[in-house]
UniProtKB/Swiss-Prot annotation:
Domain of life: Bacteria
Entry EC no(s): 1.17.7.4
UniProt protein name: 4-hydroxy-3-methylbut-2-enyl diphosphate reductase
One of the record's GO molecular function terms: metal ion binding
Keywords on record: 4Fe-4S, Iron, Iron-sulfur, Isoprene biosynthesis, Metal-binding, Oxidoreductase
Matches recorded under PANTHER family: 4-HYDROXY-3-METHYLBUT-2-ENYL DIPHOSPHATE REDUCTASE
Cited CDD domains: lytB_ispH
Listed pathway(s): Isoprenoid biosynthesis; dimethylallyl diphosphate biosynthesis; dimethylallyl diphosphate from (2E)-4-hydroxy-3-methylbutenyl diphosphate: step 1/1; Isoprenoid biosynthesis; isopentenyl diphosphate biosynthesis via DXP pathway; isopentenyl diphosphate from 1-deoxy-D-xylulose 5-phosphate: step 6/6
Cofactor note: Binds 1 [4Fe-4S] cluster per subunit.
NCBIfam families documented for this protein: ispH_lytB (TIGR00216), PRK01045.1-3 (NF002189), PRK01045.1-4 (NF002190)
Amino acid sequence: MPPTVNMGIPGASRSIVENLKRKRVLLAEPRGYCAGVDRAVETVERSLRKYGPPVYVRHEIVHNRHVVETLERAGAVFVEETDYVPEGAIVIFSAHGVAPTVYAAAAERNLRTIDATCPLVTKVHNEVKRFARNDYDILLIGHEGHEEVIATAGEAPTHVQLVDGLAAVQQVVVRDENKVVWLSQTTLSVDETMRIVERLRQRFPKLQDPPSDDICYATQNRQVAVKAMAPECELVIVVGSRNSSNSVRLVEVAMGSGAGAAYLVDWAKDIDPAWLAGVTTVGVTSGASVPDILVQGVLKWLAERGYDVVQSVTTANEALVFALPREIRSAH
């Protein structure tokens, strides 16, 4: 059983490597699949079993190349818009959510829809609708062009303004400073988001907070684990795809928390051996849309190069499970 470095679970122990010079890996816990991703991927898998291929999916079901390619081989067809789906066919909406206009377009073509939107994204959609009904200006902190942001803003486009970074704060214009609320994309850096909120509040002192955290539990947990291990790491390897917002944020968090270097890789083969020069401790984690088989591939690659001591850095335990969409709950 590998030694454990526990940074947040009561009653757990911290084992010390006898030879501190020995090459080692710090493995972040939690990492990888979150409840929303697990639900979305299983939705596609069960739909393929229930209805048979092809099953159409609007956009990548989650932002991970391995997952998408695996589902494509099983018969999933990924399309950018519902226009590419044959009339009357089944289409699954990705974990990132869709705007009401997408539902309307699907209905016009008699498509049978299955919604794999993460329930935590749906929560933000509901917040947008509620604040829009009360005629608030909604400042949505997020990344321009990200599918989740497009979908969330689409719930109330006349009320939502995107705030993409600190520089965008100065461009915000509101109608009534007493009726302003901020919401956020679920996969952002917690620290960066709060810096933006602080700047917004300097401009709008009566800025309201969301009813509850919009940044999801899994995003926060993975960032906390990286923060805990980064100061001890000369190198952090984040397994994840470049179009995965939460994976990219983990690289940023690692660098901002004291790691000597941090890189994003899809697979073990993407690792440059030159990164290991002079490195004793390597941190490893993965984004919320990454299956653990890819992390195991990285650990094997590192072990072959002498990094054969693996210590878990545990900051939280996760047990959340979301119910599947009703259309496929009976499929096994």
